[in-house]
A protein has these predicted regions:
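Surface-exposed amphipathic alpha-helical tracts and adjacent flexible/coil segments at the periphery
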Residues: 2-32, 36-43, 61-62, 68-96, ...
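Gly/Gly-Pro- and Ser/Thr-rich, intrinsically disordered tail segments characteristic of DNA damage-repair
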Residues: 86, 120-121, 125-134
Protein backbone atom coordinates (compact mmCIF):
# COMPACT_ATOMS: atom_id res chain seq x y z
CA UNK A 1 0.00 0.00 0.00
CA UNK A 2 2.76 2.43 0.91
CA UNK A 3 4.71 4.02 -1.96
CA UNK A 4 8.49 4.38 -2.27
CA UNK A 5 8.46 7.91 -0.89
CA UNK A 6 6.61 6.79 2.23
CA UNK A 7 8.99 3.88 2.79
CA UNK A 8 11.90 6.33 3.03
CA UNK A 9 10.37 8.28 5.89
CA UNK A 10 8.51 7.45 9.02
CA UNK A 11 4.77 7.86 8.72
CA UNK A 12 3.59 10.99 10.49
CA UNK A 13 0.20 11.10 12.16
CA UNK A 14 -1.76 13.92 10.50
CA UNK A 15 -3.41 16.62 12.52
CA UNK A 16 -7.21 16.58 12.52
CA UNK A 17 -8.22 20.21 12.06
CA UNK A 18 -11.88 20.99 12.77
CA UNK A 19 -13.98 24.12 12.24
CA UNK A 20 -15.15 26.12 15.24
CA UNK A 21 -17.53 28.98 14.59
CA UNK A 22 -18.19 29.50 18.31
CA UNK A 23 -16.57 28.74 21.64
CA UNK A 24 -19.05 25.90 22.15
CA UNK A 25 -18.03 24.36 18.81
CA UNK A 26 -14.35 24.74 19.71
CA UNK A 27 -14.78 22.77 22.91
CA UNK A 28 -16.97 20.20 21.17
CA UNK A 29 -14.48 19.61 18.36
CA UNK A 30 -11.60 19.06 20.77
CA UNK A 31 -13.74 16.84 23.01
CA UNK A 32 -14.51 14.66 19.99
CA UNK A 33 -10.92 14.25 18.88
CA UNK A 34 -9.74 17.29 16.93
CA UNK A 35 -6.04 18.05 17.36
CA UNK A 36 -6.59 21.65 16.33
CA UNK A 37 -9.42 24.02 15.45
CA UNK A 38 -9.65 27.06 13.23
CA UNK A 39 -11.76 30.02 14.22
CA UNK A 40 -12.52 33.54 13.04
CA UNK A 41 -11.59 36.73 14.80
CA UNK A 42 -13.44 40.03 14.78
CA UNK A 43 -11.78 41.12 11.52
CA UNK A 44 -10.12 39.94 8.29
CA UNK A 45 -11.99 36.64 7.95
CA UNK A 46 -14.30 35.20 5.27
CA UNK A 47 -17.20 34.11 7.49
CA UNK A 48 -18.87 37.24 8.79
CA UNK A 49 -21.88 35.18 9.99
CA UNK A 50 -19.93 32.41 11.71
CA UNK A 51 -20.19 33.74 15.27
CA UNK A 52 -16.65 35.08 15.27
CA UNK A 53 -14.61 35.20 18.48
CA UNK A 54 -13.90 38.13 20.76
CA UNK A 55 -10.43 38.28 22.33
CA UNK A 56 -11.93 37.11 25.61
CA UNK A 57 -13.46 34.08 23.90
CA UNK A 58 -10.17 33.41 22.14
CA UNK A 59 -8.35 33.43 25.47
CA UNK A 60 -10.83 30.95 26.93
CA UNK A 61 -10.63 28.79 23.83
CA UNK A 62 -6.83 28.78 23.83
CA UNK A 63 -6.75 27.86 27.52
CA UNK A 64 -9.18 24.98 26.91
CA UNK A 65 -7.17 23.79 23.91
CA UNK A 66 -3.91 23.81 25.84
CA UNK A 67 -5.49 21.74 28.61
CA UNK A 68 -6.23 19.11 25.96
CA UNK A 69 -2.95 19.40 23.99
CA UNK A 70 -4.74 21.03 21.07
CA UNK A 71 -4.08 24.15 19.01
CA UNK A 72 -6.16 27.11 17.87
CA UNK A 73 -5.65 28.81 14.50
CA UNK A 74 -7.33 32.04 13.37
CA UNK A 75 -8.51 32.54 9.78
CA UNK A 76 -7.67 36.02 8.52
CA UNK A 77 -7.91 35.19 4.85
CA UNK A 78 -9.86 38.07 3.33
CA UNK A 79 -8.68 39.85 0.19
CA UNK A 80 -7.87 43.39 1.27
CA UNK A 81 -8.77 46.53 -0.64
CA UNK A 82 -7.28 49.94 0.06
CA UNK A 83 -7.77 50.80 3.72
CA UNK A 84 -8.79 47.30 4.81
CA UNK A 85 -5.35 46.65 6.24
CA UNK A 86 -5.60 49.47 8.79
CA UNK A 87 -5.29 48.04 12.29
CA UNK A 88 -3.99 44.69 11.05
CA UNK A 89 -0.73 44.98 12.97
CA UNK A 90 -2.54 45.45 16.27
CA UNK A 91 -4.91 42.59 15.38
CA UNK A 92 -2.07 40.14 14.72
CA UNK A 93 -0.20 41.21 17.87
CA UNK A 94 -3.35 40.55 19.88
CA UNK A 95 -3.60 37.06 18.39
CA UNK A 96 0.01 36.35 19.25
CA UNK A 97 -0.37 37.66 22.78
CA UNK A 98 -3.52 35.63 23.47
CA UNK A 99 -1.68 32.44 22.52
CA UNK A 100 -3.03 31.63 19.04
CA UNK A 101 -0.92 28.89 17.45
CA UNK A 102 -1.02 30.28 13.89
CA UNK A 103 -2.89 32.65 11.62
CA UNK A 104 -4.28 31.58 8.23
CA UNK A 105 -3.75 34.32 5.62
CA UNK A 106 -4.03 34.65 1.84
CA UNK A 107 -3.29 38.32 1.07
CA UNK A 108 0.44 39.15 0.71
CA UNK A 109 -0.19 42.53 2.34
CA UNK A 110 -1.54 40.90 5.49
CA UNK A 111 1.25 38.32 5.42
CA UNK A 112 3.84 41.11 5.34
CA UNK A 113 2.10 43.04 8.11
CA UNK A 114 1.84 39.94 10.30
CA UNK A 115 5.49 39.01 9.80
CA UNK A 116 6.64 42.56 10.52
CA UNK A 117 4.26 43.62 13.27
CA UNK A 118 3.75 40.31 15.09
CA UNK A 119 7.02 38.37 14.83
CA UNK A 120 6.75 34.93 16.36
CA UNK A 121 3.17 34.34 15.22
CA UNK A 122 3.31 31.43 12.72
CA UNK A 123 1.63 32.06 9.35
CA UNK A 124 -0.25 29.47 7.28
CA UNK A 125 -1.17 30.22 3.67
CA UNK A 126 -4.92 29.97 3.07
CA UNK A 127 -6.49 27.88 0.33
CA UNK A 128 -7.72 31.21 -1.07
CA UNK A 129 -4.17 31.77 -2.35
CA UNK A 130 -4.58 28.83 -4.78
CA UNK A 131 -1.30 27.01 -4.14
CA UNK A 132 -1.19 24.17 -6.67
CA UNK A 133 2.49 23.25 -7.18
CA UNK A 134 5.68 22.72 -5.19
CA UNK A 135 7.42 25.83 -6.59
CA UNK A 136 4.66 27.93 -5.07
CA UNK A 137 5.05 26.17 -1.73
CA UNK A 138 8.82 26.68 -1.84
CA UNK A 139 8.28 30.39 -2.50
CA UNK A 140 6.09 30.75 0.56
CA UNK A 141 8.52 28.71 2.63
CA UNK A 142 11.27 31.18 1.72
CA UNK A 143 8.93 33.98 2.79
CA UNK A 144 8.83 32.44 6.26
CA UNK A 145 5.48 30.63 6.22
CA UNK A 146 5.23 27.35 8.12
CA UNK A 147 2.31 25.71 6.31
CA UNK A 148 0.35 25.91 3.07
CA UNK A 149 -3.30 24.94 2.70
CA UNK A 150 -3.49 23.45 -0.77
CA UNK A 151 -6.06 24.63 -3.28
CA UNK A 152 -9.02 22.28 -3.36
CA UNK A 153 -8.39 21.74 -7.07
CA UNK A 154 -5.14 19.83 -6.43
CA UNK A 155 -5.22 16.13 -7.36
CA UNK A 156 -3.85 13.28 -5.25
CA UNK A 157 -1.11 12.76 -7.83
CA UNK A 158 -0.13 16.41 -7.45
CA UNK A 159 -0.17 16.12 -3.66
CA UNK A 160 2.39 13.31 -3.93
CA UNK A 161 4.57 15.34 -6.31
CA UNK A 162 4.41 18.40 -4.07
CA UNK A 163 5.47 16.39 -1.03
CA UNK A 164 8.43 14.87 -2.91
CA UNK A 165 9.78 18.33 -3.66
CA UNK A 166 9.19 20.38 -0.51
CA UNK A 167 9.19 19.83 3.23
CA UNK A 168 6.91 22.70 4.23
CA UNK A 169 3.81 21.51 6.08
CA UNK A 170 0.86 20.63 3.85
CA UNK A 171 -2.76 21.07 4.89
CA UNK A 172 -5.58 19.76 2.71
CA UNK A 173 -9.36 19.76 2.88
CA UNK A 174 -10.72 16.27 3.40
CA UNK A 175 -14.40 16.81 4.28
CA UNK A 176 -17.14 19.36 3.82
CA UNK A 177 -18.66 21.81 1.36
CA UNK A 178 -16.93 22.61 -1.92
CA UNK A 179 -17.03 26.11 -3.37
CA UNK A 180 -18.04 26.12 -7.04
CA UNK A 181 -15.50 28.85 -7.75
CA UNK A 182 -11.73 28.45 -7.96
CA UNK A 183 -10.43 28.01 -4.40
CA UNK A 184 -13.26 30.14 -3.15
CA UNK A 185 -12.53 33.18 -5.30
CA UNK A 186 -16.07 34.14 -6.21
CA UNK A 187 -17.89 37.33 -7.18
CA UNK A 188 -21.42 35.95 -7.43
CA UNK A 189 -22.40 37.51 -4.11
CA UNK A 190 -21.02 40.86 -5.25
CA UNK A 191 -23.44 40.84 -8.19
CA UNK A 192 -26.40 39.10 -6.56
CA UNK A 193 -26.49 40.58 -3.07
CA UNK A 194 -23.98 43.46 -3.08
CA UNK A 195 -21.78 41.54 -0.64
CA UNK A 196 -18.10 40.76 -1.22
CA UNK A 197 -17.44 37.06 -0.68
CA UNK A 198 -13.71 37.72 -0.62
CA UNK A 199 -14.13 40.07 2.30
CA UNK A 200 -16.41 37.90 4.42
CA UNK A 201 -19.78 38.49 2.78
CA UNK A 202 -20.54 35.28 0.87
CA UNK A 203 -24.30 34.84 0.59
CA UNK A 204 -23.97 31.43 -1.12
CA UNK A 205 -25.58 32.68 -4.32
CA UNK A 206 -24.44 29.50 -6.09
CA UNK A 207 -26.87 27.49 -3.98
CA UNK A 208 -29.88 29.63 -4.84
CA UNK A 209 -32.46 28.22 -7.23
CA UNK A 210 -32.55 29.91 -10.64
CA UNK A 211 -35.16 29.81 -13.36
CA UNK A 212 -33.98 28.76 -16.82
CA UNK A 213 -35.59 30.24 -19.93
CA UNK A 214 -35.32 29.49 -23.61
CA UNK A 215 -34.79 33.14 -24.63
CA UNK A 216 -32.99 36.19 -23.15
CA UNK A 217 -34.79 38.88 -21.21
CA UNK A 218 -36.81 41.31 -23.27
CA UNK A 219 -38.07 38.69 -25.70
CA UNK A 220 -40.93 36.23 -25.64
CA UNK A 221 -39.60 33.38 -23.55
CA UNK A 222 -40.68 30.25 -21.74
CA UNK A 223 -39.58 28.77 -18.45
CA UNK A 224 -37.93 25.39 -19.01
CA UNK A 225 -39.49 24.25 -15.74
CA UNK A 226 -42.96 25.19 -16.94
CA UNK A 227 -42.45 23.45 -20.29
CA UNK A 228 -41.25 20.30 -18.55
CA UNK A 229 -37.78 20.32 -20.14
CA UNK A 230 -36.22 20.35 -16.68
CA UNK A 231 -37.78 19.04 -13.47
CA UNK A 232 -36.38 21.57 -10.98
CA UNK A 233 -34.97 25.06 -10.95
CA UNK A 234 -31.26 25.37 -11.65
CA UNK A 235 -28.47 25.75 -9.08
CA UNK A 236 -24.73 25.70 -9.66
CA UNK A 237 -23.26 24.24 -6.49
CA UNK A 238 -21.10 21.19 -5.93
CA UNK A 239 -21.74 18.13 -3.81
CA UNK A 240 -19.72 17.93 -0.60
CA UNK A 241 -16.30 16.33 -0.21
CA UNK A 242 -15.60 13.21 1.82
CA UNK A 243 -12.22 11.47 1.80
CA UNK A 244 -12.97 8.95 4.54
CA UNK A 245 -12.34 6.06 2.13
CA UNK A 246 -8.91 7.40 1.15
CA UNK A 247 -7.15 7.98 4.47
CA UNK A 248 -4.09 5.82 3.58
CA UNK A 249 -3.31 7.78 0.41
CA UNK A 250 -3.57 11.12 2.18
CA UNK A 251 -1.23 10.03 4.96
CA UNK A 252 1.23 8.21 2.72
CA UNK A 253 1.45 11.18 0.38
CA UNK A 254 2.49 13.39 3.26
CA UNK A 255 -0.53 15.52 4.16
CA UNK A 256 0.28 16.98 7.58
CA UNK A 257 -3.16 18.34 8.44
CA UNK A 258 -6.62 17.01 7.55
CA UNK A 259 -8.94 20.00 7.31
CA UNK A 260 -12.69 19.74 7.86
CA UNK A 261 -14.86 22.50 6.40
CA UNK A 262 -17.80 24.01 8.28
CA UNK A 263 -17.39 26.89 10.74
CA UNK A 264 -21.06 27.74 10.34
CA UNK A 265 -22.29 24.19 10.93
CA UNK A 266 -23.69 22.73 14.15
CA UNK A 267 -22.02 20.94 17.07
CA UNK A 268 -23.79 17.83 15.76
CA UNK A 269 -21.77 18.09 12.55
CA UNK A 270 -18.52 19.09 14.23
CA UNK A 271 -18.67 16.30 16.81
CA UNK A 272 -19.64 13.60 14.32
CA UNK A 273 -17.09 14.41 11.63
CA UNK A 274 -14.23 14.98 14.09
CA UNK A 275 -15.08 11.70 15.80
CA UNK A 276 -15.07 9.74 12.53
CA UNK A 277 -11.78 11.06 11.19
CA UNK A 278 -10.05 10.60 14.53
CA UNK A 279 -11.17 6.96 14.57
CA UNK A 280 -9.98 6.43 11.01
CA UNK A 281 -6.59 8.05 11.53
CA UNK A 282 -6.04 6.21 14.83
CA UNK A 283 -6.90 2.92 13.16
CA UNK A 284 -4.53 3.49 10.27
CA UNK A 285 -1.62 4.63 12.42
CA UNK A 286 -2.04 1.63 14.70
CA UNK A 287 -1.74 -0.90 11.86
CA UNK A 288 -1.22 0.59 8.38
CA UNK A 289 -0.80 -2.71 6.56
CA UNK A 290 -4.12 -4.13 7.77
CA UNK A 291 -6.14 -0.92 7.72
CA UNK A 292 -9.73 -1.18 6.50
CA UNK A 293 -12.20 1.68 6.16
CA UNK A 294 -15.17 0.68 8.32
CA UNK A 295 -18.69 0.97 7.00
CA UNK A 296 -19.82 2.46 10.33
CA UNK A 297 -17.58 5.48 9.68
CA UNK A 298 -19.20 6.07 6.29
CA UNK A 299 -22.67 5.59 7.75
CA UNK A 300 -21.88 8.04 10.52
CA UNK A 301 -20.88 10.78 8.07
CA UNK A 302 -24.13 10.33 6.17
CA UNK A 303 -26.01 11.09 9.39
CA UNK A 304 -24.82 14.70 9.20
CA UNK A 305 -24.60 15.01 5.40
CA UNK A 306 -26.41 17.97 3.87
CA UNK A 307 -25.66 16.96 0.28
CA UNK A 308 -24.32 13.97 -1.56
CA UNK A 309 -20.65 13.15 -1.00
CA UNK A 310 -17.76 12.76 -3.46
CA UNK A 311 -13.98 13.16 -3.60
CA UNK A 312 -13.71 16.61 -5.16
CA UNK A 313 -10.74 17.03 -7.50
CA UNK A 314 -8.51 14.42 -5.88
CA UNK A 315 -9.02 11.79 -8.60
CA UNK A 316 -10.57 13.60 -11.54
CA UNK A 317 -12.34 16.76 -12.55
CA UNK A 318 -15.86 16.55 -11.13
CA UNK A 319 -18.51 15.69 -13.70
CA UNK A 320 -22.20 16.56 -13.75
CA UNK A 321 -22.69 13.76 -11.23
CA UNK A 322 -20.77 15.77 -8.63
CA UNK A 323 -22.74 18.97 -9.24
CA UNK A 324 -26.15 19.90 -7.85
CA UNK A 325 -27.69 21.22 -11.05
CA UNK A 326 -31.22 20.10 -10.35
CA UNK A 327 -32.99 17.25 -8.61
CA UNK A 328 -31.23 15.99 -5.48
CA UNK A 329 -31.28 12.52 -4.05
CA UNK A 330 -32.87 12.36 -0.61
CA UNK A 331 -30.18 11.92 2.03
CA UNK A 332 -30.90 9.89 5.21
CA UNK A 333 -30.00 12.71 7.56
CA UNK A 334 -30.64 12.70 11.27
CA UNK A 335 -31.89 15.56 13.41
CA UNK A 336 -29.82 16.74 16.37
CA UNK A 337 -32.21 16.82 19.35
CA UNK A 338 -30.13 17.23 22.50
CA UNK A 339 -26.92 17.02 24.48
CA UNK A 340 -26.19 15.42 27.84
CA UNK A 341 -25.44 17.84 30.68
CA UNK A 342 -25.05 15.29 33.48
CA UNK A 343 -25.78 11.70 34.45
CA UNK A 344 -26.71 10.17 37.81
CA UNK A 345 -25.34 6.63 38.01
CA UNK A 346 -27.52 5.74 41.01
CA UNK A 347 -30.82 6.61 39.32
CA UNK A 348 -29.67 6.19 35.69
CA UNK A 349 -31.23 9.57 34.96
CA UNK A 350 -29.62 11.93 32.43
CA UNK A 351 -30.11 15.69 32.45
CA UNK A 352 -30.42 16.89 28.87
CA UNK A 353 -30.50 20.22 27.05
CA UNK A 354 -32.94 20.10 24.16
CA UNK A 355 -31.77 21.27 20.71
CA UNK A 356 -34.75 20.24 18.56
CA UNK A 357 -38.22 18.86 19.22
CA UNK A 358 -38.51 15.26 20.34
CA UNK A 359 -41.28 13.38 22.11
CA UNK A 360 -42.16 10.35 24.17
CA UNK A 361 -42.24 7.38 21.82
CA UNK A 362 -39.40 8.64 19.61
CA UNK A 363 -36.46 6.37 18.84
CA UNK A 364 -33.31 8.34 19.69
CA UNK A 365 -29.61 7.61 19.46
CA UNK A 366 -26.96 8.63 22.00
CA UNK A 367 -23.36 8.97 20.87
CA UNK A 368 -20.11 10.17 22.36
CA UNK A 369 -16.38 10.25 21.63
CA UNK A 370 -14.97 6.95 20.46
CA UNK A 371 -18.18 5.55 18.95
CA UNK A 372 -20.01 4.82 22.20
CA UNK A 373 -23.40 4.58 20.47
CA UNK A 374 -26.72 3.14 21.56
CA UNK A 375 -30.39 3.67 20.74
CA UNK A 376 -33.51 3.65 22.88
CA UNK A 377 -37.13 4.69 22.86
CA UNK A 378 -38.11 7.74 24.89
CA UNK A 379 -40.52 6.49 27.55
CA UNK A 380 -40.54 9.15 30.27
CA UNK A 381 -39.45 12.80 30.43
CA UNK A 382 -39.65 15.43 33.18
CA UNK A 383 -39.10 19.17 32.97
CA UNK A 384 -37.01 21.18 35.44
CA UNK A 385 -39.97 21.42 37.80
CA UNK A 386 -40.21 17.64 37.92
CA UNK A 387 -43.45 17.56 35.94
CA UNK A 388 -44.03 14.72 33.49
CA UNK A 389 -44.03 15.90 29.86
CA UNK A 390 -44.82 14.18 26.56
CA UNK A 391 -42.84 16.55 24.34
CA UNK A 392 -39.73 18.73 24.57
CA UNK A 393 -40.78 21.63 22.32
CA UNK A 394 -38.93 24.62 23.77
CA UNK A 395 -35.48 25.53 22.41
CA UNK A 396 -32.68 24.81 24.89
CA UNK A 397 -35.07 23.58 27.58
CA UNK A 398 -33.56 21.34 30.26
CA UNK A 399 -35.21 18.02 30.99
CA UNK A 400 -34.50 14.68 32.66
CA UNK A 401 -35.07 11.17 31.42
CA UNK A 402 -33.92 7.61 32.20
CA UNK A 403 -31.34 6.19 29.79
CA UNK A 404 -30.58 2.59 28.92
CA UNK A 405 -26.80 2.88 29.32
CA UNK A 406 -24.41 5.24 31.14
CA UNK A 407 -23.74 8.53 29.34
CA UNK A 408 -21.35 11.42 29.91
CA UNK A 409 -21.60 15.22 29.74
CA UNK A 410 -21.04 16.26 26.14
CA UNK A 411 -22.65 13.16 24.64
CA UNK A 412 -25.08 13.99 21.83
CA UNK A 413 -28.59 12.81 21.02
CA UNK A 414 -30.16 12.59 17.58
CA UNK A 415 -33.12 10.96 15.86
CA UNK A 416 -33.85 10.03 12.30
CA UNK A 417 -35.90 12.63 10.43
Amino acid sequence: MMNEMTAKRKLKRPEILAPAGTLEKLKTAIHYGADAVYIGGNAYGLRSRAGNFTYEEMAEGVAFAKEHDAKVYVAANMVTHEGNEEGAGEFFRSLRDVGISAVIVSDPALIEICATEAPGLPIHLSTQASATNFETLEFWKEEGLERVVLAREVSMEEVAEIRKNTDIEIEAFIHGAMCISYSGRCTLSNHMSMRDANRGGCSQSCRWKYGLFDMPFGQERNSLTDTGEIEEEFSMSAVDMSMIEHIPELIENGVDSFKIEGRMKSIHYVSTVSNVYKAAVDSYMEDPENYVCKQEWIDELWKVAQRELATGFYYNTPTENEQLFGERRKIPVYKFVGEVLSYDEATQIATIRQRNLFSVGDEIEFYGPGFSHFSQTVEIMHNEEGESIDRAPNPMMVLAMPVAQPVKPGDMIRKRK
